[in-house]
């Protein structure tokens, strides 16, 4: 159960998890931009799978932060 209220933007109702998804997506893009020049993707077997797991971990951490 989230402590955030339901957001209403231009008459559209968004659940509280929507803010957590957007924050984790923004943090994912920043972190990916930082990791690409370091060359860590050369050691990753499947970059798309790595990105999905990274986003999942970030979403979990942010959702635990807000709950």
From Swiss-Prot:
Record GO cellular component, one term: plasma membrane
Annotated TM spans: 3-23, 43-63
UniProt subcellular location: Cell membrane
Record keywords, A-Z: Cell membrane, Membrane, Transmembrane, Transmembrane helix
Topology of the protein relative to the lipid bilayer: Multi-pass membrane protein
NCBIfam families documented for this protein: PRK11594.1 (NF008615)
HAMAP family to which the protein is assigned, alphabetical: AaeX
Family affiliation: Belongs to the AaeX family.
Protein's name according to its UniProt entry: Protein AaeX
Source species: Yersinia enterocolitica serotype O:8 / biotype 1B (strain NCTC 13174 / 8081)
